[in-house]
Structure formats: C-alpha cells, structure tokens
Amino acid sequence: MKTYSYETSGALFKRAAEVIPCGIYGHYSPVTCVPISHYPFFTARAQGSKFWDVDGNEFIDYMCAYGPMVLGYAHPAVDEAYQAQMKLADSVTGASARMVELAEYLVDLIPVADWAFFAKNGADVTNFAVMIARVATGRRKVIGIKGGYHGTSPWMMSAGHHGAIDDDFTHVIRIRWNDYDGLERAITENPGDVAAFIATPYHHPTFADSEMPADGYWQKVEQLLRKNGIVLIIDDVRCGFRLDMRGSNEYFGFKPDLICLCKAMANGYPISALVGTETLKTDAGRVFYTGSYWHSAGPMAAALACLKELKRIDAPKVMLEKGKKLLDGMVAIAKNHGYHLKATGAPSMPYLRTTDDESLMFHQQLCGECTRRGAYFTSHHNWFLSTAHTGEDIQRTWDILDDAFKAMKK
C-alpha cells in the first residue's frame, strides 16, 4: 500500500516557525504527532469525512478537527445558512435575531435548559459557569477531576504549566474520577466554601483510557451536591450532541445546573454555549462577561442549521452505530495479527490503544503508519466519528490498519 510524504507541509512548517511561536500552537502542534515524520501539518481543503493536505494526500479524518466536524466538512445545509446570514450581517452594532432563535431552540431541545448564553470556545463557557457558581453561592472553591480538561484559563491548569502560578489554582480541588468518597471528603474538608463541581459526563483524559461513570455515580453526586448547595457543572464541550441531543447528562440519567457546549454545535463554525436552570439565570446576568465576536450572527445561523439536522437524522444514534462497527472490525484485525486493541469511551468518540506495549511507543507507531496510509489517527487523544463517515470509509480504514500491522512486523 502506498505511503505518503509531506515535502510541502514540511517546508511550510519551516516558514511558520520563523513567524509563529512553535510554528503551530496548541492542540494542532506537531509535538502531539509521533512519529512526527508520519503526519501532515497543513490542510488544503476538506469535504465530507475527508481532508487533503498541502501535498495533495487524502485522509479519512477520525479527529474531525478535534470534534467540531460532526455532519461532515462543507455540509451544504449548514454552510448555506451561514452564507445567507453573512449576506445580511454578522458582527455589527446590535445583536441578531439569530441569537434569540438559537437560545429558544436550545431551551426547547435540552430539558434542564431555561436559558442560553453564547461565546466562541469551550473555555469561554466553562470559565463563565464557574463565575456564575461563585456569584450564586458566595463561595470560592471549585472541585474538578484529576486529568480533567476544561480549557486553558489559568484556574483550569495544574502545577507546572508555564504561565500559571500557584495562586491561580489555590481554590481548585482535584479528585479522582468515579471517587464519590473523595468528593464527599473534599466537601467536608471545606465546609460552606465549595461553589461548584465541574466534570465531563465521562472521563476522557489524554494518553489514557477513557472511563465511564460507575453505576449510580452521577445520581449519588447530584444528590450530594443538592444537599450541600453546590452547583453541578457539566463540561459537555467534547461529548455534546454525540451521545444525546438533549445533553449527555440525559444519556447517563442525571440533572446538572449548568451545561457547557461547543464542538459539535455548529459543524466547525466558531460558537459555544452555556445553558442553565432558572435558579441561576439572575446570577448569570449579574456577571459581566463578553467578547468582541460573541454576538456574531453567522455562526449562530450555522448552529441552528446544524442542530436541526443532527436532530432530524438522530445523529447520536448514527455515530454510535458507526463507531461500534469501526471498532469491532479494528479489534478483530488486531487479533488476527496477534495484537490486542482496547477501545474505551463512547464508540462515537473512542480512545484506542494497543495493550501489548504500555509505553505507548508501539501504538504511536501504529497510528502513524495508519495516518501515512490515509486514515488520520492520533495516539494521545480520543478520536471522533461523524455522520459523514461511510461504510466505504470504514472498510478502507480496516484495510489500512491491516497493512499497517503488516508493516510493523517487518
């Protein structure tokens, strides 16, 4: 099977490194792509489930732009809604009617939502959620999960991150995932001072298996927080609309106070949302929180179109089924070659690794071999399925994985 080379991408990265810190920053940085020689750095175009790099190589994309692509790149209904709004107005003096329409739609769609607020990135709304909780309770402390990720605001980081100081997370308490006793202990040790508990619906760290909630975990957590007047914040930025259109909490059967949404909300257009209960609406209004482009109407129109299409086709069900089919086949292929692939998390956004080498070096090489054959995988982060991935894509991916295992044996 043909393998790709990346001469144009490499040359462009050298230019980028001259004028941009690290060449490419953040989660697109090449440091996450190991072996680095097996990955492209720059994309030229995208359509459906695929993208093409600047060297003309075609990839079935299982990262989906790290989550925002959910219906397929360049989806006509979403793009047309965006373009129609852009012909009218986007960032202008005054809010758009699209903002009201989108808020109404989310309130109708999500059972716990009585109101909605819009921003751009996931961190915008996780940060806002914590601010609301502190205003509502008059307390300082926030409990989070060790290894949990809620963006790059200083309070969200942990010790050792460049640019953050100890004071930034003085009031953040970290506990282990699924550790109900640890949560109860943290509340007891900080009487009357815990404002919020923030967590993802299930635990999806990097470089480690995803973990589902234990039976009854969320129901017990919800009851404990209600008893102690603590705000329950669900960071649904990554899982949102991939497990349940009504919020991932509905998938697991509990009711948070605030839900943070972003990635799959608008099929790649820049928008995030915080939705919450009536009891927190007044406190949300007391916090002055804004951004230069947070009222942009184009992404709001795109989000409306995206959410309606996701609901129409029952996208969570579609993606879960596609993911299960993909993973079952991959596990079987690995077994045929004498290896063991372990899939964790939801099939619509799984984390995969080979258990034959705990160092991850073998798995990194395997993902790289698949990528340079046309199935874009990362080894450190969960993948994403979209409704655009086809049966043909899945079969092609199986063929690529089979060839990659053969190459690893040579």
Regions found by a protein language model. Name each.
Residues 1-410:
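Conserved N-terminal phosphate-binding loop of PLP-dependent enzymes in the Aspartate aminotransferase
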